[in-house]
A protein has these predicted regions:
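Alpha-helical transmembrane segments in multi-pass membrane proteins
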Residues: 25-33, 48-60, 77-82, 86, ...
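Long hydrophobic alpha-helical segments that form multi-pass transmembrane helix bundles
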Residues: 118-192
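Loop-to-transmembrane alpha-helix initiation sites
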Residues: 120, 124, 234-241, 263, ...
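C-terminal ends of transmembrane helices
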Residues: 10, 58-70, 106-118, 193-201, ...
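Membrane-interface helix-loop-helix junctions at boundaries between adjacent transmembrane segments
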Residues: 78, 83-151
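N-terminal signal-anchor module of multipass membrane proteins
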Residues: 1-53, 57
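Cytosolic-side transmembrane-helix boundaries in multi-pass membrane proteins
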Residues: 1-22, 280-320
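Structural signature of hydrophobic alpha-helical transmembrane segments
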Residues: 42-55, 92-101, 174, 178-188, ...
Length: 320
C-alpha cells in the first residue's frame, strides 16, 4: 500500500511548454526578420548572426564550466540572446565587436547575476547598450557596400526625420525594409509576422507590446517634432527598433512584470521613455535604453500592481 500512495515532490501540475520549447518558438518567430536581414544586407548579415550566436553559446558554456555549474546551453536561451543581439547590430560592425557584445551579454548581464531567471535586464539589450557606449561610431555606421557599390549609405530613417523632417523618408520603404538600419529592425512586416507567430503559439500576450506602442504613439502625437501629425507618428512607429523591441525584448519573461496590470504599466513606462529619448535626446533612437530603464522599475511596478489576495482587508479597516 505504501508504494501505491508514494508520490514525488511537487510540482504535480506541469505546463507543456518548457524553457527550451519556448526559446525554440522565439527563434522560429525571429526567422522572418533574420531572413529578410540576410536578403537585405547580404551574407555578411548571416556571418554576424552566426558569429554572435556562437559567441553567446560559447561564453555560457565556458563560464559554467569554470564555476563547475551544470551546463544550460541546451535550453537555447543563449541562442535567443545571440540572435536578438545580432539583429540589433549594424551589418558593417567589426566582427570582434560583435563577439565582445555577445560575451558581455552572457557573462556580465546574465551569468554574473545567477543565470537565466536572475538577470535584471535583457541580456541582448545589455550587450547592445554596452557596444553603443564603447563603440558609438561603429554602432551608428549604417553604410553598406556590396561588390563595391553602396547598397545603403547615410542615416537611418529616424535620423533623417530628426534632422531633415518627414519628407525625407518613405513610410512604404520602412514597412518593407528598404532602408538603412540594423540587421533585424528594418522590415516592420517581417517583425509583425514573427509577432503573430509568438501570439498564436502563446509565447506572449499583447499587454506589454500594445501598451508600449499605443503610449509611444500618443506621446509622439502630442509632443513629437511634428505634433498632431498622424503620418509623422506612423513613420516614428515604423522607424528604428521600436517594433522589434516591443514584441521581442520588452516581453522577456525574466525582466518584465508578471501581473496583468504590471505588464500594462511596464509597457506605458517603455512608451513614455522611448518618446522622451526620441524627442529630447541627442540620439534619434531610444528603445534599448528605455526598456533597460523600465527593467529597473519592475520590482516597484510588481509591488504596486500585485492583486490583493481574496479575503484580505486593508489595515485601516481591520482597526475600525
Amino acid at each position: 500500500m505504501s508504494d501505491l500512495f508514494h508520490v514525488s515532490s511537487s510540482p504535480h501540475v506541469r505546463a507543456k511548454d518548457s524553457t527550451d520549447r519556448i526559446m525554440l518558438y522565439v527563434i522560429i518567430a525571429l526567422l522572418p526578420a533574420s531572413l529578410f536581414g540576410i536578403y537585405n544586407f547580404g551574407f555578411r548579415a548571416l556571418f554576424i548572426i552566426l558569429l554572435t550566436i556562437a559567441s553567446c553559446v560559447a561564453s555560457e558554456w565556458v563560464f559554467e564550466y569554470i564555476v563547475k555549474k551544470k551546463s544550460t546551453i541546451t535550453d537555447l536561451s543563449a541562442v535567443v540572446t545571440g540572435l536578438l543581439l545580432a539583429l540589433n547590430l549594424p551589418v558593417a560592425l567589426p566582427w570582434w565587436e560583435a563577439v565582445l557584445g555577445g560575451v558581455f551579454a552572457i557573462i556580465i548581464v546574465k551569468c554574473m547575476f545567477g543565470g537565466l531567471g536572475q538577470n535584471f535586464m535583457n541580456p541582448a539589450l545589455g550587450g547592445r547598450c554596452f557596444l553603443l557606449i564603447a563603440f558609438a561610431a561603429d554602432m551608428t555606421n549604417f553604410n553598406v557596400t556590396r561588390n563595391g557599390v553602396d547598397v545603403y549609405s547615410g542615416a537611418t530613417p529616424l535620423a533623417l526625420i530628426k534632422n531633415e523632417g518627414l519628407s525625407s523618408v518613405n513610410v512604404r520603404d520602412m514597412l518593407i525594409g528598404n532602408t538603412a538600419g540594423t540587421i533585424g529592425e528594418t522590415s516592420v512586416i517581417a517583425i509583425l509576422i514573427g509577432a503573430i507567430i509568438m501570439i498564436l503559439l502563446g509565447v506572449i500576450d499583447l499587454k506589454i507590446p500594445a501598451s508600449y506602442i499605443i503610449t509611444f504613439a500618443v506621446f509622439m502625437f502630442l509632443f513629437g517634432a511634428q505634433q498632431f501629425d498622424i503620418n509623422y507618428v506612423v513613420a516614428e512607429l515604423c522607424g528604428g527598433g521600436l517594433m522589434l523591441g516591443a514584441f521581442f525584448m520588452a516581453t522577456d519573461y525574466v525582466t518584465s512584470p508578471i501581473t496583468p496590470m504590471g505588464k500594462i504599466i511596464f509597457g506605458i513606462c517603455c512608451g513614455i521613455l522611448t518618446g522622451v529619448f526620441r524627442c529630447f535626446g541627442a540620439n534619434a533612437e531610444g528603445v534599448s535604453f528605455a526598456i533597460i530603464l523600465s527593467n529597473c522599475l519592475v520590482p516597484i511596478i510588481e509591488k504596486v500592481s500585485i492583486p490583493r489576495a481574496f479575503g484580505m482587508v486593508k489595515e485601516a479597516k481591520k482597526n475600525e
